[in-house]
Each structure stands twice: as C-alpha cells, then as structure tokens.
Amino acid sequence: MINPSTKVSTKVLDKKYNFKIEYKLIKNKDLLKSRLSEIPKSSGCYLFKDIDNNLLYIGKSKTLRNRVSSYFNNYAELSPRLSLMVRQITEIEIIVTDSEYEALNLESNLIKTNKPYFNILLKDDKKYPYLCITWSEQYPRIFITRKRRNRNNFDRYYGPYVDVGLLRKTLFIIKKIFPLRQRPRPVYKDRTCLNYSIGRCPGVCQEIISSEDYKKTMKQVSMIFQGRNDDLEVFLERKMNQYSNDLEFENAAKIRDQISGLKLLTESQKISIPDSSINRDIFGIVSENNISSIQIFQMRSGKLIGRIGYTQKIDNSDETEILQRVLEEHYINVEGVEIPSEILLQFNLPKHNTIEEWLSELRQKKVKLIIPKRNKKFETVEMVLKNAKLELERILNGIQDNESSIEDLTQILELTNQPRRIEGYDISHIQGTDPVASQVVFIDGIPSKQNYRKYKIKDPNIFIGHSDDFASIYEVIYRRFKKWSKFKIDGGDISSLQDKKKSTLENDLLTDWPDLIMIDGGKGQLNAALKALTQLDLHEEVNICSLAKKNEEIFIPGFSKSLDTDQNQKGLLLLRRVRDEAHRFALSFHRNKRSARMNRSQLSQIPGLGPSRIKDLLEHFNSIDAIRIASREELSKVKGLGMHSANDIYNYFNEL
C-alpha cells in the first residue's frame, strides 16, 4: 500500500491510472501499444509492478508518456539491469502532478517509503563500506557493513565511505567517547561482561539502562555522521553546565570527557579550507570506458568530515543525468538537517532549478547549487575531481586485469564465448560426517556473494565412516541443473540463454545460467559432474572443467590428461580464486553444521528432550553455553518446557 507523506494536493493524487494485466507487457506488443497510448503527456510519477504486485521501480518525468514508452521502444539499448526489470513489468501505475517540482517531491517520498529494488541506482557493489545504526532494535547497534540491501526501513545507513581506515578509526574513537552496545548478543545470560565494568557499555544485556535513555545516546552519536559535530558540542556543553549547576560533578566529568574526545575526533579530520562558517557538499564525476566515478566531499565548518564514493555504469546516459540522479538519491536518504547550505558542482544539472527548490524544501532553508569558475571553491571542486579520477583509474585497472584473466581462460579452455559467470563447486565433510557442498559465483571475475548457495547432501549412502565425493558432486550438479533440463524437455532453447540481454525468458532461468562451471577436484570429480549433466541431457550445452589441488591441473571432458598451462597464467589464477573461494565457503558451512549437530547431540543426552524441544532451546538461547549457565526460571520460560524439564536440564549441566 503506497501512502507517501507528500505535499501534492488531493486533486493531483486523484488523477490516477491503473493498468493491470495478467502477464508481462513486453510479451504482448498490441496490449503494450494500447496501454502506452493511454498514459497522459503531463508531468508526474510512474510505478512499475510485477505479477505479484511488488514495486519494481518508481520514476518521474515532465512528459510521462514519452518517458515510460522509452523503456519499451528502446528495449534493446537498455542496460542488463533495466532490461531485466522491463521483462518483469505487468502493471504500470501513473500519478499525475501539476508541476515537475511536485513530481520530484512525490518521487522522493515514494522511494523513501517503498524502497523499490530497481531504484537503487547506486547499487550495493560492496566496493565501499557503510556505517549502519539499527534503529529497528530496542538497543540499536552501530557497525560497519558493506551490505545495504534488505535493510529494515527504520535502520539508517551512512556512506558509502571511500576511506575505510578513517571510518574504522572514527568508530573506534566514538566507542571510547560514548558508552555503547558492543556485541550483537550478550556473553552471559545473567550478568554483565567486562565492557560494562570498564564503562564501555551501559549494561544493555541486563537492561541496566532503559531503551529510551540508550537511544538518546545513540542520537548524539548519529549527529557525528550527520556532520553536526558543532551542534553536538554545544548540546554537550549545555548538559555539562546543567550537571555542574545541579552539583552532579561525576556526570559533569563524564560529559567533559566526551567533549574532549569529540574535539580530538574533529581535529583528526585533516583537510580544511577557508570559509569555515559555511557547510557544503562538493560533487564530482569523471567517466571513461562507460564507467563513472562519483565522489562527494562533505565539508562542515571547514573540515572534511566525510568522503563518499560511488561507481556507476553510464548505460547511454550523459554525466549530467548521472550526477543529478546520484544527487537525488543521496539526499533522499538523509534528514533535512544534514543538507548543507551550499552544494558545489562542476556543471549545471538538467533540472538545476527544480533540484535547488526541492533541496530547499527538504532543508526548510535556502540551498544553493553553485558552479564555481574561479577562487577557492573552484579549487575545491578540482580536488574532488582529481580524487574521482584516481579512483576511476584504480577501478579500470582492476577491470582490465579481470578482463585479461577472462580472455586468457577463454583461450585455455577453447570456449566459444567468454565466461562472464563462473560457478565453482566443492564438497566438505569429515569421514562422511555432515556432508555439504558449496556453489560460489564469480561475475566478470568478481565474487557475487548474493548468488552463493549451500547444499546439504541428501544421499542416504553417505554417512559417518562412508564418504563419497563423486556421489556428492553428482547430486549437487543434478539438483542445480534440473530446472534447465525441464525447460529443454518442454521445448525451450538452451542457446537463447547465452544472450541474456535480448532474451524474454523468466529471470531465474536466464540470470542463473553459468557460462562455465568449475569442480574442485580431479578427473573423477569432473566425470561425476559430467554424468549428472549427461542424464539431464545438458552435457553439450554446459561448459565444465575441474581444477585439482595437487599440481593445479585443469581437466576438461574428452581428455584423459590435464591441460598444459603455465602456473602463472592469468586464466589459471582466476580459476584458483574460484576454487579457493568454493573451498572456504563449503568448509565454513560444514563447520557450522557440525557445531549445530554437536550442540543437539549433547542436549539429546538429557532425558525427556526430543528434537522439537532441543530446537526450541537453541532458538531461545542461541548457544549451548547460554543454556549451560541459565537458571531454572530462565529455562522454564522456553516454549513448551515446564519446570520439571527445566530442572532436568539445570541438574544435567550443574551435576546435581
């Protein structure tokens, strides 16, 4: 349900058009033409939805019909990301506004409220880290993360920051200045840990501090990442003086130490420029080879308090459009108090005046977009552009290395097409115990962790004391490729999967298809995988190889001996990275599974505890150690566990 907080009039919102269909628009040209002709040529917002009524994308335009039509008329020229989106559209919703400014304001509120998947222009490529504060939790945590997707709507992300070292240092100092929650879970169930004793934590685990008071402290911390150090210092000084007037000298001393730490933090921000009374953000964009590097320098009171970086594929857009979209998306995710009075740019934006009006509305004060031509402001923009250029060069060098590795691997394996998506598989167990498998994915030579998968081996012939790597590999490959075998049996053309941009297939069939799969092992493991593909009638369509650990030998179907390769060849090094990552991921999963089994095994020795109660216990306490130190009363609170069973568990661990 879309319920944005917006100043658009009711009259405007009543002008709403809803085009609902039962299948994808891109597959029905006549219906698509009819629907597009019904879209008005006025300004407003458009909302793309899929067959399950999920919001895919929210956009705005001065001329709605032209903008929406461009997605379908120029489909072949769209980026892979947008073409994937267009293939899923089954419904278009239109909201007409009276002006372009109202459309921008409405779009901002709709995106902030609904967070559609394809609206993340500044996609989470994990190049730069974010600072997260989990406001959705009773006692919010603060931590550094490289993952922004699937976040709770109440949580707040700052960044992404280019200088991860400075970010870690800042967070380290903050945790020394302010008593904050240090751990995601408590160490002990019934007492505080050392962090409370030394004043690093206010006793969150035992709720010694109330949630309301703790959130007040976290609110002060958030001001630092909003660039409001001066405001925070003034607030703390007033608080310190109040404590002094009330003769609460111990509390006043704590605030004094916080002020000293805050000043130390401010002084550590090395770069400074004149005009210290002005707060400003400086945007710069540099592009080459269809990739743009965008840098944002956040200057507050003359100090550089934040350096934010993004990379973006150009996708037939010019730099002015990209920079405007980056600016919009950046300020959609901040509070009004975080927007500075000046924003320096290298050129005018396509909707320069509209953006300026929108930002002023968000800030509730005048915001100026300035394109300096000379003096210190111009030099500051040049400094940002220089940093953006250096970052772009670093990115392009990395891309070039990956491209040469992929090209070399193509030649080594004599592939028809370059392996853009490589999947690596490995098995992990101890003498048949807890057998698992991993599937890792590298796209363009870079790990794509959101596409990793774990497999629990189901073969009943694999058990403690009886391992079978070949049978395990066979099972995993068979399970992985079974859906494509069904697609082929139903008359589907597997070759159409190669052109992922132009295909109109369902996205799970399309985007998952690997250009190459690599098995960790030798000829035996390769043959096991090949056996599964042969039974699925996919052995001719799937490119496959294996990489043996002993001599880093590559095996391919049809050859009894390994390929003749140089140990330092870039293609081989890429395969080794895939193999090592598959091994790491499988081993990690195996250890977790083994640990969970051992916990269950220990609990199963307690009379009266079956699998269901053991599961409830572990879900309630998170670990066997927490169960071990729990009191009878705490144990009895577990769902379905009475005092009698609680006594049995307590006596078991305390040897009574």
From Swiss-Prot:
SUPFAM superfamilies listed in its UniProt record: C-terminal UvrC-binding domain of UvrB (SSF46600), GIY-YIG endonuclease (SSF82771), RuvA domain 2-like (SSF47781)
SMART domains: GIYc, HhH1
Signal peptide start and end residues: none
UniProt GO cellular component terms: cytoplasm; excinuclease repair complex
GO MF term set: DNA binding; excinuclease ABC activity
CDD domains named among the record's database cross-references: GIY-YIG_UvrC_Cho
Subcellular location, record wording: Cytoplasm
Domain GIY-YIG, residue spans: 41-120
Entry function: The UvrABC repair system catalyzes the recognition and processing of DNA lesions. UvrC both incises the 5' and 3' sides of the lesion. The N-terminal half is responsible for the 3' incision and the C-terminal half is responsible for the 5' incision.
Summary of subunit composition and partner proteins: Interacts with UvrB in an incision complex.
Protein name according to UniProt: UvrABC system protein C
The organism of origin for this protein: Prochlorococcus marinus subsp. pastoris (strain CCMP1986 / NIES-2087 / MED4)
Origin organism lineage: Bacteria, Bacillati, Cyanobacteriota, Cyanophyceae, Synechococcales
Gene: uvrC
